[in-house]
Amino acid sequence: MNTIKIAGVPEHFNLPWHLAIESGDFEKENIDLQWTDVPEGTGKMCQLLRDGETDIAVILTEGIVKDITAGNPSKIIQVYVESPLIWGIHVAANSKYNTLTDLKGTTAAISRLGSGSQLMAYVNADNQSRLHSGWKTDDLQFEIVNTIDGAVQALKNGTADYFMWERFMTKPLVDQGIFRRIGDCPTPWPCFVIAVRKEVLEKQADVISKILSIINQTTVDFKNIPSIDTTLALKYHQKIEDIQEWLSLTHWSQNQLKAEMLNKIQNQLIQLKIIDKKGTFEDLVETV
């Protein structure tokens, strides 16, 4: 049995992995795929890849691109979710802030340095700077909160003013009157990719190829699974109508990241001063 460790966020995007593991699809191919939930998100998963504590990460595109250019010994082997991630911009329910304009000069709660929540705060500030003078990405301030529970506390205590997280996963907190959503910020690129440590690719490329084949078949069929909306709503504590909207907006991919898209992502990260140099397509991407 080939043991492979994989990490991802405990969110609805990753249910196809759990279904494939539970149904024994990997086991039939002599693969023991060991899943670890990482609620801290992309910054933490980058560290797990660097430390050799996971072999594969299902990870935010912008985060892993940034970290590979900074020396993470991993490669992107495929896009996992083609559609953008819709980041909700949230404040405490009783906050004095009502519009995105009000957030200029305030503090963003982020899970970790280098996380999607930090990188997208730069994207949002850049978007706002085009609409309103006075917004500058250099003025952004951050409070590290690790998880969504940490963000709840930070916004409640006033140590941070707003928090960006996937809109639908955060919706229950809005429904409960804990957060109030004042805007959205979709990623300008496919949201999730599959990244693998180079050492694993060199030694077990055939196993990684089998894993891709299995998950791709699962995601192709995923939306056609009977009552999948009910399954998702129950598992992730969502309203059925929210899950149905999310399903209509979400498109899984079975294709490799294209060079033009990688170039677009890196150009924007350079413009935002998140990276200072671009990697080549070969530096970042490998097809198995």
Where are the regions that the model predicts?
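Short, glycine-/small- and polar/acidic-enriched structural segments
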Residues: 2-138, 142, 161-167, 180-186
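Residues within well-ordered alpha helices
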Residues: 25, 66, 124, 172, ...
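Pocket-lining segment of extracytoplasmic ligand-binding domains
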Residues: 138, 147-232
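Secondary-structure end/capping motifs
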Residues: 202-276
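Conserved C-terminal helix/tail region of periplasmic/extracytoplasmic solute-binding proteins
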Residues: 270-288
